[in-house]
Amino acid sequence: VRPQAGATAIPAAGAPAETPPVEFTMIRTNRELFNGDRYVLMSAATDATVRDLQNASQEYPPEILDRFVQIPEGFPESVAELSRQLTAGITTPYDKAKAIEAYLRSIPYNDAIPAPPAGRDPLEYFLFDIKEGYCDYYATAMAMMLRVAGIPARTASGYAEGLFDEESGAYFVTERDAHTWVEVFFPEYGWVEFEPTAGESPLDRLPGEDPTELTANSQQPEPTPAAGDAAAAPTPQTGPEE
């Protein structure tokens, strides 16, 4: 751990801890962190294969449906229509998620874009106007388009892997590695991550090569935004999307 001076937040629990899978939690230390401090993080990562996720049940628990398929009032119809176009003819939630993920990864990455104009919906601005953005935009767009398709989804925030230092055998993670991605709920497997941000390494799903590379949906539509400015959807943000 190499924190900034006076830092108390850590990116994972410093002691054994159990967190319900649908809750948001931030763990903090009760003292300052110093150079050389160490802690151990153990994570339970799914070993579900592509085929497992394609064949997963679509019977979602009520507590998941209650929280993670919500669409805000006034959500832009143009974004909802794009979701319908991208998932048309696809039967499984996994393949729908991959179709949306692939479309978003084709949008150029730019972490220095200006803020949306006053009154312009952030997702419409990202998808149809400026057509570039950073991780918060990609993740929010994917999570909301999945919800339009009736698939439980949320955004999550943390850090990318950083840079590996061969001499120390450690990864160096800084504030610049802060990142937002998408998690999709699959019964029996829980929350499974997806990476819609262009420029980030795609997530490898066991076993090896993903056999669902959008053969039926390789042609990506060019949607036409709805007439006029849609009512504002939530501004892209980090943290699990409630």
Regions found by a protein language model. Give the residues of each.
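Structured beta-strand-rich cores of soluble
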Residues: 1-89
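Juxtamembrane membrane-insertion context
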Residues: 50, 62-63, 69-71, 108-110, ...
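Soluble periplasmic/extracytoplasmic beta-strand elements of cell-envelope proteins
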Residues: 40-42, 103, 181-183
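Alpha-helix initiation and N-capping motif
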Residues: 38, 62, 76-80, 94-97, ...
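A generic structural micro-environment signature
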Residues: 33, 47, 77, 115, ...
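Residue-level signal for well-ordered alpha-helical segments
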Residues: 18-22, 60-63, 77, 112, ...
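Active-site neighborhood of thiol-dependent amide/isopeptide-bond enzymes
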Residues: 86-180
